[in-house]
Amino acid sequence: MAVITAAMVGELRALTDAPMMECKKALTEADGDPVKAEEILRVKLGSKASKAASRVTAEGVVASCVVGNVGALVEVNCETDFVTKNDEFLALANACAKLIAEHNPADLAALGALPLDGKTLEEKRAELIGRIGENMSIRRFVRFETAGKVVSYLHGTRIGVMVDFDAADEQVGKDVAMHIAAMKPVALSSDDVPADLIAKERSVAELKAAESGKPAEIVTKMVEGSVHKYLKEVSLLNQTFVKNDKQTVEQMLKDTKSTVKAFTMYVVGEGIEKKQDDFAAEVAAQVAAAKQA
């Protein structure tokens, strides 16, 4: 049995980026052969990544990159809040945003194929899954390239906003981005609100109005009033501006001779169903499995 020294472990770690204990185990299994140990680690890390790939990634971060009139916003997910504070995970998210801004990939597959530190982004992602032991995925991204200006705003790491705008004062764009993060509009104007959201709101309003027992013509007016109110509440231009409750966002833009052409907001995990762990059931299942063994 070969003697495994700290220097051998350090060299293998530098080569593979694997955890120290994993490196030591691999060297022991390979009887001190660094080439075999590297192969063992690649298999183990690959297996670790494959096992993690089926787990839900509802945590994560939003990262952004703005260079001149080009901006990128990306959501990168992981399984636990703990990993969102990991420096390597944060570096991967920021690298994603930079690659998107620089290369304009057509989709997630094209993004994953882009080069990063001598490998592809997808290879770097798989390696990080292997090292951390937790699934992570690039969920979505958007890229703005405009003749005007682009600004991004991150509220912590969980909410990200990017705005395409025209204004003499860049602070206007920053204020609008902060407003969007706070008020969470779903569209620029009432006309842009998705039809499915309007239909859902109308259905709820109809049920509430029907319970009032009022005449049909009154019920119809109540429904239309509710829908109209909803459209004002969820469209950016109609919302009351957070920095001045005496005017709407649209009025503020007119006063400053500014326009907002488009915006995107990402909220981490939005729409992802998180797995609810049942610890008691998990223990019971393990006990039952042990009895059958």
Curated annotation (Swiss-Prot):
NCBIfam families for the chain: tsf (TIGR00116)
Species in which this protein is naturally found: Herminiimonas arsenicoxydans
GO molecular function: translation elongation factor activity
Domain of life where this protein originates: Bacteria
GO cellular component: cytoplasm
Family per record: Belongs to the EF-Ts family.
Name of the featured protein: Elongation factor Ts
Compartments (UniProt record): Cytoplasm
Main location: cytoplasm
PANTHER family: ELONGATION FACTOR TS, ELONGATION FACTOR TS, MITOCHONDRIAL
CDD domains documented for this protein: UBA_EF-Ts
SUPFAM superfamilies referenced in this protein's UniProt entry, alphabetically: Elongation factor Ts (EF-Ts), dimerisation domain, UBA-like
Signal peptide: none
Keywords: Cytoplasm, Elongation factor, Protein biosynthesis
